[in-house]
Amino acid sequence: MARLTAEFGDRIYYNQVMDRGAMRQLIGRLIIYLGSNCTSQILDQLKTLGFRHATQAGISLGVDDLITTPSKTWLIRDAEYQAYTSEEQYRRGSIHAVEKLRHVVETWHTTSEYLKREMTSHFRITDPLNPVHIMSFSGARGNVSQVHQLVGMRGLMANPQGNIIDLPIQSNLREGLSLTEYIISCYGARKGVVDTAVRTADAGYLTRRLVEVVQHVVIRNPDCETNQGIRLHSIRDRKTTRDAGGNSLLSLQERLIGRVLARNVFLGKRCIAIKNQDLAPDLVNSLVNFPKALLSPGSEGGHCEILVRSPLTCKSMPRACQKCYGWDLSCGNLVEIGAAIGIVAGQSIGEPGTQLTLRTFHTGGVFTGGVAEHVRAPFNGIVHFSISSSTHKTKTIQPTRNRHGRPAWTCPEAFSVIIEDRIGKKKVLNVPQYSLLLVKNHQYVQSRQIIAEVRASIAPLKEKIEKNIYSHLQGEVFYNPIGLRASCLKQRHFLHFLCSASRMNLWIEFASIRSYLSPLVEKTSYIWIFSGRLNKFFNATLNLSFFYQTQDYIQRDLPIGIQNHVFNYSKVFLLSIYNRQRSVTFSVSRRDIRLGRKKKFTDYIPLSRISTDKIFSKHTGSIHTISEQNEWILTLSFVDQFSKKMFSSVQTPGTSKVSEKSEEQIIDFQEQLILNYPLSKTTIFLKEPSILAKNYSIAEKDSCIGLLGEFFIFLNELSIVSVRTFISTSQINLFLKKNVFSLLCITHGNTFKGKEKIFFINDSKNIYNIKNWLISVNFLIWCHFSNRILNKNQTLATIFLSNRSLRNEKDLQVKEFKIGQSICPSRDLGEKIFEPFTHSILPESGHLLSLNEGNLLIRLAKLYLIPTGGIAHTFHKQTINEGDTLVTLAYERLKASDIIQGLPKAEQLLEARVGNQVVINLYMRFEILVARIKEQLRNYIGSLTQMDLMLSQISVNRASKALEYSQLETVDQVQKVYLSQGVYISDKHFEVIVRQMSSKIAIVENTDFTAFSPKAVIRTAFPYDVLGVFFPGEILDISKAQKMNRVLYKPLPCKPVLLGITQASLNANSFLSEASFERTITVLSRSALQGRMDWLKGLKENVLLSKMIPAGTGLKQAPVLLSPNGTGTLFSNNEQNIFQKKNVTSLSKSKGQKVQIRKIFSFQKSPQRLSFLYQETSSSNIRRKIQPTVCLCKPFITKRNWLHISLKQLTEQSLNYETKKFCLQELTNNFIPRKKENIFYLKKKTIKTT
């Protein structure tokens, strides 16, 4: 022992578990410090050592090692109870089908994930050396999901379409599956086989498209000498409100390794890293871990972000340079010149998708993902809590309706919940901010009951789909009155109010009025009523105000006010017809009701938005009058019967469609309330898109309309009316043309059947004894009400007093059966109306037809709840068959998070499809933020004033920032898709792809409003423009546009485009590359008509023609041109004829051998096409190679040994379209303008000879 201690005493000993991550770090450091040869030998020895120890250890796996978690029993029981509760609520009509499906899926998903966490902790505590636990958590074989299926529960399965089956598999593979569970589990096996076959082809096609778009990108030069760069940051999970930062998926250190600095980094006044220095791991750790305060503002200005060079900012378009690309990740050094980085980038992104498609076979198609956490009660007790902020202003919880259709409350901030049992034991539970509270204060809860739902730290993947609800019966459709509708339209903080006995405006100014429009469904939603104060104008007298207190919470089924007035309408009904409006003749019977002594009431009649579901007449009539004898009189004009096509199209608010020669008129309701313009065929109605949400169903029986949500029951009288409604407060906001039409309608939120048959049998006047307990249906609370008398200047204040809970006394409810009412199934009819029905259970839901002393006649029915936004496909009293579509619901559902759903998301990002929400946001930001992209494309050369230079520099900086943001956001989004699967791909590969996607601009017309017109355009001295060179819609490279704008008087009208990888491949500079990719016939036909030429600069074009590819050793340096007479000029010609034959020589230096290249330009008079001969002669080789190629001419004029060209002469030449384009491109590539002269001078190129 002493010998061993002496031998190894001076060596460092590491005690660390060598898992997958540690091995990756070890191999990386070995390659950097020792090289690949030594690393391979060391890894071979490690492999031998691992096999020997694995043989000696002899870990085995048996059936007894599969231990089931004890908490599975009560978790399954709780999930089954919640699923049963959702099914019962769906049968009663309390929730709709989407809420039921969502609740069942999320309940089982939450149970499965919770059981997985319990399984992990159970293994760690009871048996940490369990072979199953060791194998799965060491990374040797298996993962947590597979072990969970063995000893936990298989959970929810996903079908081949990725949809989640709502029937879970409760058993695990250790216990064995039932027949139904086995059939469902076969979905997963089939899904794995199908994905292996089909999805692999999809991933391979993605690789082909990626390689196609960047196959020509090659490292061409060492440095492009750019001063631009990008700032990187760590990539985190999807952010939520509770966890603003999220978990780090990719650290900043990993993203910086192998990059090159674009700017010096200073620590104080000392430079610690210089520009163009590559970042090794040690230097990256030092830079990132420096405190922010020590970094000088000149470098990174208090940021942790380092400015590094990137292919996105490289000036060597369309190639790249060594400095901007950085390290070759295979060797840890700068990439070599000639490396085909485009091919490497395409394969690096596409190949992991091909390999990851095999993962679904091993997981068996089991659905996994992040879930919301629950705060449960530890024992039985009473809940106590209070919410208050640090600013001593009480923040009340806001009532809402959760995703499962149950009442909940949103918590504005984090707070504590105290649970106290009978003996005084207390437990404090912390509820995070913006959680959903599912219990009320001072409520009794049971053990393990869910108190609050905490939002998931990682938002699960969701998708928006539509679900059709089909009829389970054959029969007739009846729509209950479409709920309550409370709306308050904010318009200049005023509401139009029609005063009584006069046609003038009385305005109600609100101190705090909010825009609010929410359809309310009975027993499932809530209403807010706002308060305000009255301002009197024109000495108008108004004694009472029907406005409640600010934000008083009012439950749906509670009585709100009692008044003694009933209006009996006879034969009032409405037929809703799409695109046609039919009105019928009806009459209104008046009934004068005395309201009290010396009191005046005003009916609240707001202005209603005109839509097609209202009753229109040819002329508007009187609306509302009140006499002076303290009586209430309601009058309506008679409506003649007519049927006319009112409008031809449904338009959104703010637009109008009119006939020709019509002038726009705006109705000012403050000056004139009633306009008697007749209707005509050209009248267009301003219609909101949601048609079905505004259809008010009016029954064909005698109806009564109540005011402002009243609930009153008259006993021992001939009429018993129950009215619970609120009056709509929407307003007219019209912009009509030509024939202006206005209508003020008396609108109501709901109508109720008020015949004498309510609570009567065959018009009998006997009334049965009805208990007068008024109980809320929503929360089952005994409530006693005390109503204050309305004085002159007081607002109505209804006080709600709750005494005790009725949790165990659910049978004592309001006797609310009446003729024509729909009854939910499984309701106890005991002590409802008649004694013979005591303790009778209704087996099925139905429609109550008649009440007799001995029996009830119920028509079998099925209840369906339609939420907001649902699209109904049937009408009231329509006969349908079984299986017909009733309604279509749009909702979000969870989506499986494997690579099968990840690859389509990455493909949507790379293809820049508009259907993807992320791409929409990026594209909108790309167009909005790059509002002045034209300044970036233009190189300002000429006489600049100081102000012009400052303005142009600001525009260029702004456009550059916007373009950089859009590119980096796309890179991060695609990176997150692969990081979610545990695959890290270097950022530089994504940047090469994204650069090609965003390197194009589209030519637009000058009259296009999307074209960019910079404020500080630098005008050159040329008065001529090159017209007809580019057509609108033509795609150009940004680099070409930059060069063209140098010689144009007016910059090209263009806008940036974000092309997908397929479109970018089809808009390449090589028609051979385009034709060999897709749409061969289309590309070749278009190229032949345009006379395109291929310069064979990419890899694919040379491979097609069996030439040496311009990469690696086949990359040639660009030749340096010299003049034949050695005077430093390329051409020396004093003749004015631009079409002539001229021999030009140039010199190239390659591999130490001087090769003389002779280019012969053969010009003809006014040619359309020219022949181009390329002769290569060598001093060491007498052979000559002559290769004919088709190209176009370069027209030029020489004068005084300087080459210049007149744009006027170019535009007047009889050249075709492609020739003009070529001439313009070649001019901008070789010439620069001289200040204040109509001459373009040649770029002088010198060569150093030894």
From Swiss-Prot:
Question: What positions belong to coiled-coil segments?
Answer: none
What Pfam families does the record point to? RNA_pol_Rpb1_4, RNA_pol_Rpb1_5
- Which cofactor does the UniProt annotation name? Zn(2+)
Q: Name one GO biological process term.
A: DNA-templated transcription
Cite the cofactor comment. Binds 1 Zn(2+) ion per subunit.
Q: Which reaction does it catalyse?
A: RNA(n) + a ribonucleoside 5'-triphosphate = RNA(n+1) + diphosphate
Q: Name one GO cellular component term.
A: chloroplast
Q: What does this protein do?
A: DNA-dependent RNA polymerase catalyzes the transcription of DNA into RNA using the four ribonucleoside triphosphates as substrates.
Per its UniProt record, what NCBIfam families does this chain match? Answer: rpoC2_cyan
Q: Which family does it belong to?
A: Belongs to the RNA polymerase beta' chain family. RpoC2 subfamily.
Q: How does it assemble?
A: In plastids the minimal PEP RNA polymerase catalytic core is composed of four subunits: alpha, beta, beta', and beta''. When a (nuclear-encoded) sigma factor is associated with the core the holoenzyme is formed, which can initiate transcription.
Its recorded name reads: DNA-directed RNA polymerase subunit beta''
Its taxonomic placement starts with: Eukaryota, Viridiplantae, Streptophyta, Zygnematophyceae, Zygnematophycidae
